[in-house]
Regions:
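Glycine- and acidic-residue-enriched helix-capping/strand-helix junction motifs
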Residues: 39, 43-53
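Short hydrophobic targeting helices and cationic amphipathic motifs
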Residues: 4, 8, 14-17, 22-24
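Eukaryotic N-terminal low-complexity, Ser/Thr- and Lys/Arg-rich leader segments
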Residues: 26-30
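Short glycine/serine/threonine-biased micro-segments
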Residues: 38, 44, 96-99, 103, ...
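Proline/glycine-rich low-complexity loops and linkers
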Residues: 107-166
Length: 166
């Protein structure tokens, strides 16, 4: 399961990481499928335009990975958990965007932790990355929240905003 920060353009580091990871998987499987989950009340209400679905689906299909489904869901814990559980049994990969920022309604990371029964807390490496990214005195509680995720997560570096995905 890979998570991308909401509505940020794909960067080369992220793309290279995912290409390498999926290449390793593709060498062992004949057909690979994926689903995309867009998480956010702001997308459902129309306040924020989803900029990732087309880019991600086009890119995955160009790699020979068939995108079988795209869903837009609200920032609701049960909905996130249920959707992840449903799609992960149908597809080889589930990509998500949204819901892992600094605001109170960004609950994706915690919901994913619960879905996989993994401890949720400050990820030491993510915390260090963010602490270094922000100037002294600007690494407030909201920004620190972006370092909370499944504690065993593998990070996807994000030079655009500093906040790593996982």
């Amino acid at each position: 399961l890979l998570y991308l920060r909401c509505n940020l353009p794909f960067n080369k580091v992220l793309v290279n990481f995912i290409v390498f990871y999926l290449y390793l998987e593709m060498t062992n499987k004949k057909e690979i499928s994926a689903a995309i989950i867009i998480i956010g009340n702001e997308v459902l209400s129309g306040r924020t335009k989803d900029l990732n679905t087309s880019t991600l689906a086009t890119w995955l299909n160009s790699l020979g990975i068939s995108v079988g489904e795209v869903r837009v869901i609200p920032d609701v814990e049960k909905t996130i958990i249920d959707t992840v559980h449903e799609l992960r049994v149908k597809y080889n990969y589930v990509f998500t965007t949204g819901g892992i920022g600094p605001t109170h309604d960004d609950i994706t990371a915690e919901s994913i932790s619960k879905a996989f029964n993994i401890e949720y807390g400050f990820h030491k490496e993510a915390f260090a990355i963010l602490e270094k990214y922000y100037e002294p005195g600007n690494f407030n509680d909201g920004r620190q929240k972006m370092a909370k995720m499944p504690v065993t997560a593998n990070l996807i570096l994000n030079p655009t905003s500093g906040a790593p995905g996982f």
